[in-house]
Amino acid sequence: LAEAEIEYADDPCTTLFVKFPVRDDKGKLTPYAPLDKIFFVIWTTTPWTIPGNMAICVNAAFDYVLLQAPGGEVYILAKDLAENVCKAAHIDYTACKVLATLKGGEFELMTAGHPLFDRDSVILCGDHVTLDAGTGCVHTAPGFGADDFNICRAYDAAGKTHIGTPVPVNAKGVMTDEKYSGQFYAKANEVI
């Protein structure tokens, strides 16, 4: 078929912002705020892949802000996306305070707590991270995407990490992780 012969249908999807609490900041973030108040924030259109999250990717060359929201939580977001993220999350951007601006490369190999399980997600740098949409912090589940798999394997091959590749969904689209076991992946979006 020629491109002109293909009709695309809009497929509405669930989107989600997810906070990952910083666990190990390599001593770089605590001068600005207490560690228990700092979060990497990702945005995803595939919440059902969150159980497979093993990393968060940032772009080493981008500017990221530590944005303190009303209430005291501090969010790590790409500087160029911060205002849009606040608007989408119903946070008054004008009431927020930028505590610091850092290059994405400064976050490399920090860790954040997984939002659903007692394990860490490591922070990696990848050129596939863009400023087109989202937060500038990309949810990375190596069992669910080529970019995710390739960046995790590259870090493993370089001896920098030892990232697993969980695939908590079987060939029929049914969740296999015990917490969501038996649910069809699209239904798991609502629970996750």
Regions found by a protein language model. Give the residues of each.
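Active-site cores that bind ATP or allylic diphosphates and position pyrophosphate for catalysis
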Residues: 1-41, 49-50
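Non-cofactor substrate-recognition interfaces
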Residues: 29-41, 47-192
